[in-house]
Amino acid sequence: MFIEQMFPFINESVRVHQLPEGGVLEIDYLRDNVSISDFEYLDLNKTAYELCMRMDGQKTAEQILAEQCAVYDESPEDHKDWYYDMLNMLQNKQVIQLGNRASRHTITTSGSNEFPMPLHATFELTHRCNLKCAHCYLESSPEALGTVSIEQFKKTADMLFDNGVLTCEITGGEIFVHPNANEILDYVCKKFKKVAVLTNGTLMRKESLELLKTYKQKIIVGISLDSVNSEVHDSFRGRKGSFAQTCKTIKLLSDHGIFVRVAMSVFEKNMWEIHDMAQKVRDLGAKAFSYNWVDDFGRGRDIVHPTKDAEQHRKFMEYEQHVIDEFKDLIPIIPYERKRAANCGAGWKSIVISPFGEVRPCALFPKEFSLGNIFHDSYESIFNSPLVHKLWQAQAPRFSEHCMKDKCPFSGYCGGCYLKGLNSNKYHRKNICSWAKNEQLEDVVQLI
Protein backbone atom coordinates (compact mmCIF):
# COMPACT_ATOMS: atom_id res chain seq x y z
CA MET A 1 0.00 0.00 0.00
CA PHE A 2 1.31 3.46 -0.92
CA ILE A 3 1.82 6.00 1.87
CA GLU A 4 -0.89 8.23 0.35
CA GLN A 5 -3.53 5.60 1.17
CA MET A 6 -2.30 4.81 4.69
CA PHE A 7 -3.72 6.24 7.92
CA PRO A 8 -1.13 8.20 9.95
CA PHE A 9 -1.55 8.60 13.70
CA ILE A 10 0.60 10.11 16.46
CA ASN A 11 2.24 7.51 18.70
CA GLU A 12 0.98 7.33 22.28
CA SER A 13 4.58 7.91 23.46
CA VAL A 14 4.52 11.39 21.87
CA ARG A 15 2.96 14.52 23.34
CA VAL A 16 2.13 17.56 21.21
CA HIS A 17 2.88 20.74 23.12
CA GLN A 18 0.67 23.47 21.70
CA LEU A 19 1.83 27.06 21.26
CA PRO A 20 0.01 30.11 19.84
CA GLU A 21 1.95 29.74 16.59
CA GLY A 22 2.77 26.09 16.00
CA GLY A 23 3.90 23.59 18.57
CA VAL A 24 6.51 21.11 19.73
CA LEU A 25 6.60 17.32 19.53
CA GLU A 26 7.80 15.81 22.81
CA ILE A 27 9.11 12.38 21.83
CA ASP A 28 9.10 9.54 24.38
CA TYR A 29 7.71 11.89 26.99
CA LEU A 30 6.57 9.05 29.28
CA ARG A 31 9.71 6.88 29.22
CA ASP A 32 11.85 7.70 32.26
CA ASN A 33 15.12 6.15 31.07
CA VAL A 34 15.68 8.24 27.94
CA SER A 35 19.28 9.43 27.78
CA ILE A 36 20.23 13.04 27.10
CA SER A 37 21.53 12.10 23.66
CA ASP A 38 18.30 10.30 22.68
CA PHE A 39 15.70 12.70 24.05
CA GLU A 40 14.57 15.37 21.64
CA TYR A 41 11.96 17.99 20.86
CA LEU A 42 10.79 18.68 17.33
CA ASP A 43 9.64 22.24 16.65
CA LEU A 44 6.58 22.59 14.43
CA ASN A 45 5.61 25.65 12.48
CA LYS A 46 1.91 26.47 12.24
CA THR A 47 1.32 24.35 9.12
CA ALA A 48 3.18 21.30 10.43
CA TYR A 49 1.35 21.57 13.75
CA GLU A 50 -2.05 21.71 12.06
CA LEU A 51 -1.18 18.70 9.92
CA CYS A 52 -0.02 16.70 12.96
CA MET A 53 -3.24 17.49 14.83
CA ARG A 54 -5.16 15.87 11.95
CA MET A 55 -3.19 12.62 12.34
CA ASP A 56 -5.57 10.63 14.55
CA GLY A 57 -5.75 7.51 12.36
CA GLN A 58 -9.15 8.28 10.84
CA LYS A 59 -8.04 9.78 7.52
CA THR A 60 -5.51 8.78 4.89
CA ALA A 61 -2.35 10.82 4.39
CA GLU A 62 -3.80 12.02 1.11
CA GLN A 63 -7.05 13.16 2.75
CA ILE A 64 -5.16 15.02 5.48
CA LEU A 65 -3.15 17.00 2.93
CA ALA A 66 -6.28 17.77 0.90
CA GLU A 67 -8.17 19.03 3.98
CA GLN A 68 -5.25 21.21 5.07
CA CYS A 69 -4.84 22.72 1.61
CA ALA A 70 -8.57 23.43 1.38
CA VAL A 71 -8.36 25.61 4.51
CA TYR A 72 -5.84 27.89 2.81
CA ASP A 73 -7.15 27.52 -0.76
CA GLU A 74 -3.92 25.80 -1.85
CA SER A 75 -3.32 22.96 -4.30
CA PRO A 76 -2.18 19.64 -2.75
CA GLU A 77 -0.01 19.11 -5.81
CA ASP A 78 2.13 22.12 -4.80
CA HIS A 79 2.84 20.72 -1.33
CA LYS A 80 2.97 16.94 -1.65
CA ASP A 81 6.76 16.62 -1.95
CA TRP A 82 7.66 18.26 1.37
CA TYR A 83 4.55 16.82 3.03
CA TYR A 84 5.45 13.20 2.27
CA ASP A 85 9.08 13.90 3.17
CA MET A 86 7.80 15.13 6.55
CA LEU A 87 5.71 11.98 7.02
CA ASN A 88 8.72 9.78 6.30
CA MET A 89 10.83 11.77 8.77
CA LEU A 90 8.17 11.51 11.48
CA GLN A 91 7.84 7.78 10.88
CA ASN A 92 11.62 7.29 11.10
CA LYS A 93 11.66 9.17 14.42
CA GLN A 94 8.76 7.00 15.67
CA VAL A 95 6.51 10.03 16.05
CA ILE A 96 3.80 8.49 13.86
CA GLN A 97 2.65 5.08 12.75
CA LEU A 98 0.90 4.30 9.47
CA GLY A 99 -2.18 2.10 9.73
CA ASN A 100 -3.71 0.02 6.92
CA ARG A 101 -7.26 0.95 7.94
CA ALA A 102 -9.03 3.77 9.76
CA SER A 103 -9.01 3.60 13.56
CA ARG A 104 -9.35 6.39 16.11
CA HIS A 105 -6.29 7.35 18.18
CA THR A 106 -6.24 10.06 20.82
CA ILE A 107 -3.54 12.71 20.43
CA THR A 108 -1.98 13.60 23.78
CA THR A 109 -1.47 17.33 24.14
CA SER A 110 -0.19 19.94 26.55
CA GLY A 111 0.07 23.71 26.30
CA SER A 112 -2.41 26.01 24.61
CA ASN A 113 -3.11 27.69 21.28
CA GLU A 114 -4.19 30.81 23.17
CA PHE A 115 -1.07 31.58 25.19
CA PRO A 116 2.48 30.22 25.55
CA MET A 117 3.34 27.68 28.25
CA PRO A 118 6.94 26.81 29.15
CA LEU A 119 8.87 23.72 28.11
CA HIS A 120 11.75 24.23 30.55
CA ALA A 121 11.86 25.30 34.20
CA THR A 122 14.67 26.25 36.55
CA PHE A 123 13.99 25.65 40.23
CA GLU A 124 15.83 27.80 42.76
CA LEU A 125 15.58 25.41 45.70
CA THR A 126 17.05 27.93 48.11
CA HIS A 127 18.63 31.36 48.10
CA ARG A 128 21.06 30.27 50.81
CA CYS A 129 24.63 29.39 49.84
CA ASN A 130 27.70 28.30 51.77
CA LEU A 131 29.73 30.80 49.73
CA LYS A 132 29.39 34.55 49.19
CA CYS A 133 30.57 35.13 45.63
CA ALA A 134 31.60 38.60 44.49
CA HIS A 135 29.41 38.52 41.37
CA CYS A 136 26.28 36.66 42.52
CA TYR A 137 23.19 37.97 40.71
CA LEU A 138 21.00 36.67 43.58
CA GLU A 139 23.32 38.07 46.25
CA SER A 140 23.20 34.66 47.95
CA SER A 141 25.04 33.99 51.20
CA PRO A 142 24.87 31.71 54.26
CA GLU A 143 22.42 34.22 55.79
CA ALA A 144 20.07 34.56 52.79
CA LEU A 145 16.44 33.60 53.35
CA GLY A 146 14.23 31.34 51.25
CA THR A 147 14.02 27.53 50.99
CA VAL A 148 11.20 25.63 49.29
CA SER A 149 9.61 22.73 51.18
CA ILE A 150 9.85 19.24 49.71
CA GLU A 151 6.05 18.96 49.59
CA GLN A 152 5.62 22.22 47.71
CA PHE A 153 8.44 21.35 45.35
CA LYS A 154 6.88 18.00 44.37
CA LYS A 155 3.46 19.57 43.85
CA THR A 156 4.93 22.24 41.59
CA ALA A 157 7.09 19.77 39.65
CA ASP A 158 4.04 17.59 38.95
CA MET A 159 2.02 20.57 37.72
CA LEU A 160 4.81 21.72 35.41
CA PHE A 161 5.27 18.23 33.92
CA ASP A 162 1.54 17.86 33.29
CA ASN A 163 1.53 21.20 31.47
CA GLY A 164 4.39 20.42 29.10
CA VAL A 165 7.69 20.90 30.95
CA LEU A 166 10.02 17.95 30.28
CA THR A 167 13.44 19.41 31.09
CA CYS A 168 14.51 21.20 34.23
CA GLU A 169 17.41 22.71 36.10
CA ILE A 170 17.90 22.75 39.85
CA THR A 171 20.00 25.49 41.33
CA GLY A 172 20.29 27.81 44.32
CA GLY A 173 21.92 29.53 46.09
CA GLU A 174 23.66 26.22 46.54
CA ILE A 175 21.36 23.22 46.12
CA PHE A 176 23.24 21.01 48.55
CA VAL A 177 22.54 23.29 51.52
CA HIS A 178 18.86 22.34 51.08
CA PRO A 179 17.96 19.75 53.77
CA ASN A 180 16.09 17.62 51.20
CA ALA A 181 18.48 18.08 48.28
CA ASN A 182 18.92 14.38 47.59
CA GLU A 183 15.20 13.61 47.77
CA ILE A 184 14.53 16.47 45.34
CA LEU A 185 17.31 15.28 43.03
CA ASP A 186 15.85 11.78 42.98
CA TYR A 187 12.36 13.15 42.29
CA VAL A 188 13.30 15.36 39.35
CA CYS A 189 15.41 12.63 37.76
CA LYS A 190 12.44 10.25 37.86
CA LYS A 191 10.03 12.91 36.63
CA PHE A 192 11.88 14.89 33.94
CA LYS A 193 13.72 13.78 30.81
CA LYS A 194 16.76 15.99 31.10
CA VAL A 195 18.08 17.50 34.32
CA ALA A 196 20.80 20.08 34.87
CA VAL A 197 22.25 20.31 38.37
CA LEU A 198 24.07 23.57 39.13
CA THR A 199 26.45 23.57 42.09
CA ASN A 200 29.63 25.21 43.33
CA GLY A 201 31.07 21.75 43.92
CA THR A 202 32.10 22.24 47.54
CA LEU A 203 29.41 20.17 49.28
CA MET A 204 29.37 16.89 47.34
CA ARG A 205 28.60 13.95 49.66
CA LYS A 206 28.57 10.20 49.02
CA GLU A 207 24.76 9.89 48.86
CA SER A 208 24.53 12.71 46.32
CA LEU A 209 27.29 11.13 44.24
CA GLU A 210 25.45 7.80 44.19
CA LEU A 211 22.27 9.50 42.96
CA LEU A 212 24.14 11.32 40.21
CA LYS A 213 25.73 8.04 39.13
CA THR A 214 22.32 6.33 39.05
CA TYR A 215 20.84 8.96 36.72
CA LYS A 216 23.95 9.94 34.80
CA GLN A 217 22.34 9.16 31.42
CA LYS A 218 19.99 12.13 31.83
CA ILE A 219 22.03 14.54 33.95
CA ILE A 220 24.38 17.44 33.25
CA VAL A 221 26.22 18.83 36.26
CA GLY A 222 27.28 22.45 35.96
CA ILE A 223 30.11 23.49 38.28
CA SER A 224 31.68 26.93 38.64
CA LEU A 225 35.46 27.34 38.51
CA ASP A 226 36.84 30.81 37.94
CA SER A 227 40.63 30.65 37.93
CA VAL A 228 43.58 28.30 37.70
CA ASN A 229 44.97 30.30 40.61
CA SER A 230 43.48 29.03 43.87
CA GLU A 231 43.86 32.39 45.61
CA VAL A 232 41.97 34.24 42.86
CA HIS A 233 39.15 31.68 42.83
CA ASP A 234 38.88 31.51 46.62
CA SER A 235 38.83 35.29 46.94
CA PHE A 236 36.16 35.61 44.23
CA ARG A 237 34.04 32.89 45.83
CA GLY A 238 34.51 34.20 49.37
CA ARG A 239 35.91 31.08 50.97
CA LYS A 240 39.41 29.69 51.34
CA GLY A 241 39.78 26.10 50.16
CA SER A 242 36.86 26.23 47.72
CA PHE A 243 39.18 25.89 44.69
CA ALA A 244 40.65 22.59 45.90
CA GLN A 245 37.26 21.15 46.83
CA THR A 246 35.65 22.19 43.54
CA CYS A 247 38.47 20.68 41.46
CA LYS A 248 38.20 17.46 43.47
CA THR A 249 34.45 17.28 42.78
CA ILE A 250 34.85 17.92 39.05
CA LYS A 251 37.36 15.07 38.77
CA LEU A 252 35.30 12.75 40.99
CA LEU A 253 32.14 13.18 38.94
CA SER A 254 34.00 12.98 35.63
CA ASP A 255 35.78 9.78 36.70
CA HIS A 256 32.35 8.21 37.31
CA GLY A 257 31.17 9.02 33.79
CA ILE A 258 28.92 11.93 34.77
CA PHE A 259 28.69 14.75 32.22
CA VAL A 260 30.29 17.81 33.82
CA ARG A 261 30.18 21.28 32.30
CA VAL A 262 32.53 23.77 33.94
CA ALA A 263 31.48 27.42 33.86
CA MET A 264 33.87 30.33 34.36
CA SER A 265 32.84 33.86 35.30
CA VAL A 266 35.23 36.24 33.55
CA PHE A 267 36.42 39.52 35.04
CA GLU A 268 39.58 41.62 34.94
CA LYS A 269 41.76 39.40 37.14
CA ASN A 270 41.13 36.20 35.17
CA MET A 271 40.36 37.35 31.62
CA TRP A 272 43.71 36.12 30.27
CA GLU A 273 43.34 32.72 31.98
CA ILE A 274 40.69 31.28 29.67
CA HIS A 275 43.23 29.18 27.75
CA ASP A 276 44.75 27.77 30.94
CA MET A 277 41.28 27.18 32.37
CA ALA A 278 40.23 25.22 29.29
CA GLN A 279 43.31 23.04 29.70
CA LYS A 280 42.59 22.62 33.43
CA VAL A 281 39.01 21.60 32.69
CA ARG A 282 40.21 19.04 30.15
CA ASP A 283 42.76 17.65 32.63
CA LEU A 284 40.02 17.24 35.25
CA GLY A 285 37.97 15.20 32.78
CA ALA A 286 34.98 17.51 32.26
CA LYS A 287 33.16 17.27 28.93
CA ALA A 288 32.36 20.94 28.35
CA PHE A 289 33.67 24.38 29.27
CA SER A 290 31.83 27.68 29.00
CA TYR A 291 32.68 31.18 30.12
CA ASN A 292 30.86 34.48 30.33
CA TRP A 293 31.70 37.96 31.42
CA VAL A 294 30.29 38.87 34.81
CA ASP A 295 26.94 40.54 34.16
CA ASP A 296 25.98 43.77 35.89
CA PHE A 297 23.22 42.25 38.00
CA GLY A 298 23.19 41.78 41.78
CA ARG A 299 26.70 42.02 43.22
CA GLY A 300 28.02 41.98 39.66
CA ARG A 301 27.05 45.65 39.32
CA ASP A 302 30.18 46.54 41.31
CA ILE A 303 32.56 44.75 38.91
CA VAL A 304 34.03 46.89 36.14
CA HIS A 305 34.04 45.38 32.63
CA PRO A 306 37.65 45.80 31.37
CA THR A 307 36.95 45.45 27.63
CA LYS A 308 35.22 48.82 27.44
CA ASP A 309 38.65 49.98 26.29
CA ALA A 310 38.66 49.49 22.48
CA GLU A 311 42.27 48.27 22.18
CA GLN A 312 41.87 45.92 25.14
CA HIS A 313 38.70 44.57 23.55
CA ARG A 314 40.46 43.94 20.21
CA LYS A 315 43.32 42.05 21.88
CA PHE A 316 40.91 39.97 23.91
CA MET A 317 38.84 39.03 20.85
CA GLU A 318 41.98 37.77 19.09
CA TYR A 319 43.03 35.83 22.18
CA GLU A 320 39.55 34.37 22.59
CA GLN A 321 39.45 33.13 18.99
CA HIS A 322 42.75 31.28 19.46
CA VAL A 323 41.33 29.59 22.57
CA ILE A 324 38.13 28.56 20.78
CA ASP A 325 40.09 27.16 17.84
CA GLU A 326 42.29 25.06 20.13
CA PHE A 327 39.52 23.80 22.41
CA LYS A 328 36.59 23.57 19.99
CA ASP A 329 35.83 20.04 21.24
CA LEU A 330 35.34 21.44 24.75
CA ILE A 331 33.79 24.88 24.20
CA PRO A 332 30.26 24.68 22.74
CA ILE A 333 29.72 27.38 20.13
CA ILE A 334 26.21 27.91 18.76
CA PRO A 335 26.33 28.86 15.07
CA TYR A 336 25.02 32.38 14.49
CA GLU A 337 22.23 31.18 12.23
CA ARG A 338 20.84 29.03 15.07
CA LYS A 339 20.63 32.12 17.28
CA ARG A 340 18.30 33.93 14.92
CA ALA A 341 15.18 33.52 17.01
CA ALA A 342 12.96 36.47 17.95
CA ASN A 343 14.19 36.07 21.51
CA CYS A 344 15.64 33.39 23.78
CA GLY A 345 12.24 32.31 25.12
CA ALA A 346 12.75 33.65 28.65
CA GLY A 347 9.40 34.08 30.35
CA TRP A 348 7.35 31.95 27.98
CA LYS A 349 9.45 29.00 26.76
CA SER A 350 11.58 28.78 29.89
CA ILE A 351 11.04 30.13 33.39
CA VAL A 352 12.75 30.39 36.76
CA ILE A 353 10.90 29.67 40.01
CA SER A 354 12.15 31.10 43.29
CA PRO A 355 11.89 29.25 46.64
CA PHE A 356 8.86 31.47 47.33
CA GLY A 357 7.09 30.47 44.10
CA GLU A 358 7.71 33.72 42.25
CA VAL A 359 8.14 33.14 38.50
CA ARG A 360 10.84 35.13 36.68
CA PRO A 361 11.70 35.00 32.97
CA CYS A 362 15.33 34.04 33.62
CA ALA A 363 17.78 33.76 36.50
CA LEU A 364 19.30 37.19 35.87
CA PHE A 365 16.02 39.04 36.30
CA PRO A 366 15.90 40.75 39.72
CA LYS A 367 14.21 38.81 42.50
CA GLU A 368 11.55 41.51 42.75
CA PHE A 369 10.41 40.96 39.14
CA SER A 370 7.56 38.44 39.07
CA LEU A 371 5.25 37.08 36.39
CA GLY A 372 3.10 35.61 39.16
CA ASN A 373 3.32 33.11 42.00
CA ILE A 374 3.07 29.51 40.86
CA PHE A 375 2.34 28.30 44.41
CA HIS A 376 -0.83 30.41 44.59
CA ASP A 377 -1.85 31.66 41.13
CA SER A 378 -3.39 29.59 38.36
CA TYR A 379 -1.24 28.51 35.43
CA GLU A 380 -3.40 30.48 33.02
CA SER A 381 -3.34 33.68 35.08
CA ILE A 382 0.47 33.63 34.96
CA PHE A 383 1.12 32.66 31.35
CA ASN A 384 -1.91 34.29 29.74
CA SER A 385 -1.03 37.65 31.26
CA PRO A 386 -0.38 40.77 29.15
CA LEU A 387 3.22 40.77 30.41
CA VAL A 388 3.99 37.23 29.21
CA HIS A 389 2.36 37.94 25.84
CA LYS A 390 4.54 41.03 25.55
CA LEU A 391 7.72 39.06 26.31
CA TRP A 392 6.72 36.30 23.88
CA GLN A 393 6.20 38.75 21.04
CA ALA A 394 9.22 40.97 21.74
CA GLN A 395 12.13 40.92 19.31
CA ALA A 396 15.54 40.84 20.99
CA PRO A 397 17.58 43.99 20.20
CA ARG A 398 19.94 42.26 17.75
CA PHE A 399 17.07 41.01 15.59
CA SER A 400 14.67 43.94 15.92
CA GLU A 401 14.29 46.41 13.08
CA HIS A 402 13.74 49.05 15.76
CA CYS A 403 17.23 48.69 17.25
CA MET A 404 19.66 51.33 15.97
CA LYS A 405 22.55 48.79 16.22
CA ASP A 406 25.42 50.55 14.38
CA LYS A 407 24.49 53.92 15.88
CA CYS A 408 23.97 52.69 19.43
CA PRO A 409 26.86 52.49 21.94
CA PHE A 410 25.02 49.73 23.82
CA SER A 411 24.40 47.37 20.87
CA GLY A 412 27.32 45.14 21.86
CA TYR A 413 26.03 44.96 25.42
CA CYS A 414 22.40 44.22 24.56
CA GLY A 415 23.03 41.79 21.68
CA GLY A 416 20.38 39.09 21.53
CA CYS A 417 19.30 39.47 25.18
CA TYR A 418 16.14 41.44 25.79
CA LEU A 419 16.90 41.63 29.54
CA LYS A 420 20.13 43.48 28.80
CA GLY A 421 18.17 45.73 26.48
CA LEU A 422 15.79 46.50 29.33
CA ASN A 423 18.69 46.89 31.76
CA SER A 424 20.54 49.36 29.54
CA ASN A 425 17.42 51.51 29.34
CA LYS A 426 16.87 51.41 33.11
CA TYR A 427 20.42 52.03 34.28
CA HIS A 428 22.68 53.21 31.44
CA ARG A 429 20.65 55.59 29.28
CA LYS A 430 19.16 59.03 29.81
CA ASN A 431 16.27 58.33 27.42
CA ILE A 432 14.33 55.23 26.41
CA CYS A 433 15.77 53.84 23.16
CA SER A 434 13.86 53.24 19.92
CA TRP A 435 13.95 49.46 20.46
CA ALA A 436 12.19 49.63 23.84
CA LYS A 437 9.68 52.19 22.56
CA ASN A 438 8.70 50.36 19.38
CA GLU A 439 8.66 46.91 21.00
CA GLN A 440 6.29 48.51 23.55
CA LEU A 441 8.51 47.60 26.50
CA GLU A 442 8.67 50.98 28.24
CA ASP A 443 6.49 49.76 31.11
CA VAL A 444 8.61 46.59 31.47
CA VAL A 445 11.76 48.73 31.80
CA GLN A 446 10.26 50.26 34.93
CA LEU A 447 9.79 46.78 36.45
CA ILE A 448 13.49 45.92 36.26
From Swiss-Prot:
Give the induction text: Transcription is highly induced by oxygen limitation and is under dual and independent control of Spo0A-AbrB and ResDE.
Source domain of life: Bacteria
Q: Name one GO cellular component term.
A: cytoplasm
Q: Where in the cell is it found?
A: Cytoplasm
Gene Ontology MF annotations = 4 iron, 4 sulfur cluster binding; metal ion binding; oxidoreductase activity
Q: What is the effect of changing residue 96 to V?
A: In strain: ATCC 6633
The biological processes this protein is annotated with in GO are: bacteriocin biosynthetic process
User: Any binding details for the cofactor?
Assistant: Binds 2 [4Fe-4S] clusters. One cluster is coordinated with 3 cysteines and an exchangeable S-adenosyl-L-methionine, the other is coordinated via 3 cysteines and maybe direct contact with the SboA precursor.
EC numbers listed for it are 1.21.98.-
Give the signal peptide as a residue range, or say none if absent: none
Cofactor entry:
[4Fe-4S] cluster
Per the UniProt entry, the effect of residue 309 to N is: In strain: ATCC 6633
Keywords of the record: 4Fe-4S, Antibiotic biosynthesis, Bacteriocin biosynthesis, Cytoplasm, Iron, Iron-sulfur, Metal-binding, Oxidoreductase, S-adenosyl-L-methionine
Q: Where does the chain bind [4Fe-4S] cluster 2?
A: 408, 414, 417
Note the CDD domains from the entry: Radical_SAM, SPASM_AlbA-like
Please describe what this protein does: Catalyzes the formation of 3 thioether bonds during production of the sactipeptide subtilosin from SboA. In vitro the thioether bonds cannot be made in the absence of the SboA propeptide, suggesting this is the first reaction in subtilosin maturation. In vitro, in the absence of a second substrate, cleaves S-adenosyl-L-methionine into Met and 5'-dA.
**Which PANTHER family does the UniProt record give?**
PQQA PEPTIDE CYCLASE (PTHR11228:SF7), RADICAL SAM DOMAIN PROTEIN (PTHR11228)
Q: What is this protein called?
A: Antilisterial bacteriocin subtilosin biosynthesis protein AlbA
Which lineage is the organism of this entry classified under, starting from the top rank?
Bacteria, Bacillati, Bacillota, Bacilli, Bacillales
> What is the gene called?
albA
